[in-house]
Regions:
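Thiamine diphosphate
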Residues: 1-116, 264-266, 270-482, 487, ...
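Terminal amphipathic helices with adjacent charged low-complexity linkers/tails
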Residues: 27-28, 206-218, 222-301
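Structured loop/turn residues at secondary-structure junctions
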Residues: 35, 122-123, 186, 375, ...
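Flexible, glycine/proline-enriched loop segments at strand-loop-helix junctions
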Residues: 83-84, 121-124, 179-184, 225, ...
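Short beta-strands and strand-loop turn motifs
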Residues: 119, 149-152, 423-425
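Generic enzyme active-site microenvironment
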Residues: 120-121, 149, 209, 341
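Short acidic, Gly/Ser-rich segments with clustered Asp/Glu that frequently serve as metal-coordination loops
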Residues: 124-130
């Protein structure tokens, strides 16, 4: 892997990659994504030659607290653009970065934004459907500044690729509207010419297929899958060094002349970065509107000032429709909001977004709407790439039941601390007639198990806009926003004065008991209205708690959590139209949860609610029976 890709990596970094040697975060740098994250030592070696890492960092490879973890992590190592390792996703994130570059070039002009995105992919990357789906979109969108090097050594962890793959990649990628160039991946002259040709193609992304040899340069293991994940023996290391012409006894060896040669282009790179700063100042001095846009897209998320629509308390509204109204309301206020739906525009309420902001493609780079097609996982990876690039607020939508398709990209949003908005509508069995394949059961709680992910399930339109505000003001936490298909009553500030401040804290008392609290009933989303009605039926003093976001509530000071859930009230119940496991941390082992721990069925939503007991009367009966 790392040895078969080394020639491409070396030529790219030494001769082509545009970056500021003194500032790895310079806005107009080229991006390089190592999709083949298991080849991390190649990237670390190149970053050492570039001066971002040092020899001590290399000696700490894969050790606790080092800047050289086993797979690259973008927030840990300067010069690492994306956290990679799960194969294929680096290609998706590179596609997202190239999309961001093309869009911002259209908005800011090429004097301010004009760079390339490179990715290095392995045989395993290319086999992952997420790479294929992203490549299809890159071709559709005409991302001419996306260049992927395919290290085709025809070996993967378990053996030769021909045991499991008969894909004709040149033909496949040509059919996806890519330029394809095939070369000897070890010939520096061919690599050089391929990159030059790729950079000249303005309307198509380029796939450079480098035919390479696994473990190229090793003494006896060239072409062997044994080298994929296992270190060389001491004897093989010694013999390989002798073959290449390196001092056999030196464990780590980097002569100063190698650094000098590698960095020979640095004066030119510094000059380019300096010239960009001059252009930037001149452009912004002469264009107040452009400066305003720049400041807005680079403002800290927590400083965003956003106004939201008002909702008619007399008209029930599905939270997905409330989301749609909120989205439409903020399009001008958040001018760098970019994203779309996985072919569910009407259902996800993104049609106005599409029509108002225009579809992004090569002919319309200023368009902000991304029609992802039925590609949930590529969508998630591309959203991460948009966020990693910077200057973009990414949003993607689909049905909650299909969050499983997108799950690992959502996990990578959380791991990389990217404030992506993952929107999921049709959040329970109330989907109705489409049946169990489209009715989420375990999905909300499955998302809640992902660290550093806020999962919002608002109870009405007003909680929805508050949840969206929180999501849009996060610096390092992505959000999963879960919305209903069915209409829900609108909770008003007059009747529920704690609502706005309460959502900020993840959970709050929506209805207080009349007197000393005898029973606590927790709920989220559509079941909040069920809980309010059941509380009226019960002949107990009931406190009803709305829990739109468990993660935010769990992070509150202990005093606030005890205030809502006093220890002396053991009669605790929760209701949610889905798997019940997450709620026991609130109700305790003596409490009960009214949930849904089985698959749904095809029938009208009202019929299913009756059959499954999701009525106020049956919830009240469940509580009474369990109090006995």
């Amino acid at each position: 892997g790392a040895m078969s890709s080394a020639d491409f990596g070396y030529v790219l970094f030494k001769e082509f990659l545009n970056f500021d040697p003194d500032n790895p975060d310079w806005f107009d740098r080229d991006r390089f994504v190592l999709s083949a994250g298991h080849e991390s030592m190649l990237l670390y070696s190149l970053l050492t030659l570039a001066g971002f890492l040092n020899m001590d960092d290399l000696k700490e490879f894969r050790q606790w607290g080092s800047r050289t973890p086993g797979h690259p992590e973008h927030d840990m190592t300067p010069g690492v653009e994306a956290t990679t390792g799960p194969l294929g996703q680096g290609v998706a994130m590179a596609c997202g970065m190239a999309t961001a570059e093309a869009h911002l070039r259209g908005k800011l002009g090429s004097d301010i934004c004009s760079h390339f995105t490179y990715a290095l992919a392995s045989d395993g990357d290319m086999q992952e459907p997420v790479a294929y789906g992203s490549a299809a979109l890159a071709g559709q969108w005409g991302l001419g500044r996306l260049i992927v090097f395919f290290d085709s050594n025809k070996i993967q962890l378990a053996g030769p690729t021909d045991r499991s793959d008969c894909t004709d990649y040149p033909q496949l990628y040509r059919s996806l509207c890519w330029q394809v160039i095939e070369i000897d991946g070890h010939d520096h002259g061919q690599i050089r010419e391929a990159i030059k040709k790729a950079k000249k193609e303005e309307n198509k992304p380029t796939l450079i297929i480098g035919h390479t040899t696994m473990a190229s340069g090793s003494a006896t293991l060239e072409g062997s899958e044994a080298t994929h994940g296992s270190p060389f023996s001491p004897e093989e290391i010694k013999a390989s060094k002798e073959k290449i012409g390196l001092p056999a006894e030196e464990e780590f060896f980097l002569p100063s002349e190698a650094i000098t040669d590698f960095q020979s282009r640095f004066p030119e790179l510094r000059e380019r970065a300096s010239a960009w700063k001059d252009r930037f100042k001149k452009t912004m001095d002469n264009s107040p509107e452009l400066l305003k846009y720049w400041e807005k897209i680079h403002a800290a998320p927590e400083d965003r000032q956003i106004s939201w629509p008002d909702f008619d308390p007399e008209k029930p509204l599905a939270t997905r429709k409330a989301f749609g109204s909120c989205l439409n309301h903020i399009l001008d206020q958040v001018p760098n909001l970019m994203g779309g739906s996985a072919d569910l525009d009407p259902s996800n309420q993104t049609v106005h977004f599409r029509n108002e902001c225009g579809i992004f493609n090569g002919d319309n780079p200023c368009g902000r709407y991304l029609p992802f097609g039925v590609r949930e996982f590529p969508m998630g990876g591309i959203l991460n790439g948009l966020a990693l690039h910077g200057g973009i607020v990414p949003l993607g939508a689909t049905f909650l039941v299909f969050s499983d398709y997108e799950r690992n990209a959502i996990r990578m949003s959380a791991l990389q601390k990217l404030p992506v908005l993952h929107v999921f509508t049709h959040d329970s069995f109330y989907v109705g007639e489409d049946g169990p394949t489209h009715q989420p059961v375990e999905h909300a709680n499955a998302l809640r198990t992902i660290p550093n992910l806020n999962v919002f399930r608002p109870a009405d339109a007003n909680e929805t806009k508050k949840c969206m505000h929180i999501a849009l003001t996060q610096r390092e936490t992505p959000s999963a926003l879960l919305f209903t298909r069915q209409g829900l009553p609108v909770l008003t500030r007059e009747n529920y004065p704690r609502l706005e401040e309460g959502v900020d804290r993840g959970a709050y008392i929506l209805r207080e008991a009349d007197g000393p609290v005898e029973l606590i009933l927790l709920a989220s989303g559509s079941e909040m209205h069920l809980a309010l009605k059941a509380a009226e039926i019960l002949d107990k003093k009931v406190r009803v708690i709305s829990v739109p976001c468990m993660e935010i509530f769990d992070a509150q000071p202990e005093d606030y959590r005890r205030e809502l859930l006093p220890e002396d009230v053991s009669a605790r119940f929760a209701v949610e139209a889905g798997d019940d496991t997450a709620w026991y941390k609130y109700v305790g082992t003596s409490g009960k949860v009214f949930g849904l721990n089985h698959f749904g069925a095809s029938a009208p939503a009202g019929v299913l609610a009756e059959k499954y007991g999701f009525t106020a009367e049956k919830l009240a009966r469940f509580i009474k029976d369990n109090l006995k």
